[in-house]
Every structure is written in structure tokens, then in C-alpha cells.
Design a protein with these regions (language model features):
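Domain-level cores of phosphate- or acyl-group-handling catalytic modules
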Residues: 90-151
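Active-site-proximal, Lys/Arg-enriched surface segment
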Residues: 1-71
Length: 276
């Protein structure tokens, strides 16, 4: 497996020398922003119960688990940096820290990415010290969805009501007089230290960016609520607020969804040829 990784990484680096996979560094109009490294896993369905490694994963179907890391920019389509094919019942974060470390090492060898700022994005399945530490050790920033544990809920509860800012979202209206969005979706942030249950040297300071939308319960109720309730989506990021403010950080984090298109493309192409 490691030998195949070496072949794939050398091929990618050599290809980048001949084609601007992530854009040309220093070229006119070049994107001065981040290189985004997105990490995600997906289930590839199989049907033979005796197939080696097959099992039931988070999706509830029998299959194999593919773990992917891609790199992209605002102007360049995703490029696969690393991949692992794992047994279907494996937990999503298993081996993710090593994949992140390997992928960031490959990224540094790509000519256009030399000296670029790198942001690793992932969903809550990868919110763990090992994965975050691997990214930070390699010199990248992180933007990772958090799990709603007690510390996160307490941080959200402490956000001042005046701190919420409307954002561009479905059904939002832009007010030209005030230059703001009139929207049901709002964002706010608070300082946050991740992994406080670990020893002090392993705690990671950063920001907790929270997006909230009204809770729209389709079921009728005989007891209306006394106040508006919301659904919250929070993520932890180590980016500088002067580089990515609250609204921009939220937009940037939502861009992680691009890897779902990569998953779909692979399942309709290369991964479709796996024996099922």
C-alpha cells in the first residue's frame, strides 16, 4: 500500500510540473487565498457477503469505506492528494491523521502550492486531537465541524444576542441601504479552546463559529414555544479573524461540500469498477 502511495504521489508531483493543477504561483490574477484540503470518507456499496473487508458502516449498507483527501483553490478544481480503501465497518477517523499528514507533505511538493496558506476542512467525524494536530504540525490551519458536546453548547449559550449577523442564505434579501443581508440564517463566533480534557500542551486555541437557523418543526403542537428556537451548526477554526472574518469563515467552511461531488464522480467512474 505504501509503495502504491509513493507511485501515486510521484505521478501527481510530476504532473503538477507540467500542468497548473492548482494554478501558477505568482501568475497574473493568481488566487492569493488558501489552498483547501478537504477530508471525507464515503461508503462504496457491495453485495457479496463474503467479500473481503465488506461490512456495515455509518450509512447502514454493506460496503467498503474510501477515505479521501483533496486539494483545491477558489479557481482550481479538486485534485486527489491521498486515498485509502478500508473495511466497511471502520470508524471514519481511523487513519485520518496519517492521511492528513501524508497529503500535506505531498501538497508541499506541488510547485503552485509552495508557500501557500493551507486550510484543512472536515466534518464532525474528524473532529479529534489526532487529525487536528496532524494538520497544525504540518503548518496548516483547520476548519472542522464540531460535535455538540457540553463545552460547545455552553459556548453557544454564552453568545450575546446582538452578536448574530445575517448572512446570504436561501430566501435572504440584501438591504442596499444598510449593506446587510436580511436573513433567517445568522452567524456569530466566540473564542474557543478545543480538547480541554487533554493536557495543556495538547489543547488548541481558536474560534468557534456558529450558524443558526430557526427550528421549523413540521409537526403541529398544542403548546407553542415561549421563544424562538434555533438549530445550530458550529465549527472550530484556527484561522486569523483578520484573514477570515466570521461571515467569510462560514462561507469558506461550507465550501467543504465540494468533496461530496468528488465522491459522486468517483463512484460513477473509477470506483464503479470495483468488484461488487
Amino acid at each position: 500500500v505504501r509503495q502504491l502511495d509513493a507511485v501515486a504521489s510521484r505521478f501527481l508531483v510530476n504532473l503538477a510540473d507540467r500542468a497548473p493543477l492548482l494554478g501558477r504561483t505568482g501568475a497574473a490574477g493568481a488566487d492569493p487565498g488558501f489552498v483547501y484540503v478537504d477530508v471525507d470518507d464515503t461508503i462504496i456499496e457491495v453485495h457479496g457477503y463474503q467479500k473481503q473487508g465488506s461490512g456495515y458502516g455509518y450509512s447502514g449498507v454493506r460496503g467498503l469505506n474510501a477515505l479521501l483527501a483533496t486539494a483545491s483553490t477558489q479557481t482550481a478544481a479538486p485534485v486527489i492528494l491521498g486515498q485509502r480503501l478500508r473495511r466497511g465497518s471502520v470508524g471514519s477517523p481511523r487513519g485520518a491523521s496519517r492521511l492528513v499528514g501524508d497529503s500535506l507533505a505531498i501538497l508541499k511538493r506541488l510547485v503552485p502550492a509552495a508557500g501557500a496558506r493551507v486550510l484543512v476542512r472536515a466534518d464532525s467525524a474528524f473532529y479529534g486531537h489526532a487529525t487536528v494536530a496532524a494538520a497544525l504540525t504540518a503548518g496548516a490551519e483547520v476548519s472542522v465541524t464540531v460535535k455538540m458536546d457540553k463545552a460547545v453548547k455552553a459556548a453557544i449559550a454564552g453568545i450575546d444576542e446582538k452578536a448574530w449577523t445575517g448572512i446570504r442564505y436561501p430566501q435572504a434579501i440584501f438591504d442596499e441601504d444598510t449593506g446587510t443581508w436580511i436573513s433567517k440564517a445568522e452567524v456569530a463566533e466566540v473564542p474557543f479552546t478545543a480538547f480541554t480534557s487533554r493536557k495543556k500542551t495538547e489543547r488548541v486555541p481558536g474560534r468557534l463559529v456558529v450558524r443558526r437557523i430557526p427550528e421549523l418543526n413540521p409537526q403541529d403542537t398544542d403548546q407553542p414555544t415561549l421563544f424562538d428556537t434555533h438549530r445550530f451548526h458550529a465549527f472550530f477554526t484556527t484561522t486569523d479573524p483578520e484573514v477570515l472574518d466570521t461571515v467569510t469563515a462560514d462561507q469558506t467552511h461550507r465550501g467543504h461540500a465540494v468533496i461530496e461531488q468528488v465522491n459522486a464522480d468517483l463512484k460513477d467512474s473509477a470506483l464503479a469498477h470495483l468488484p461488487s
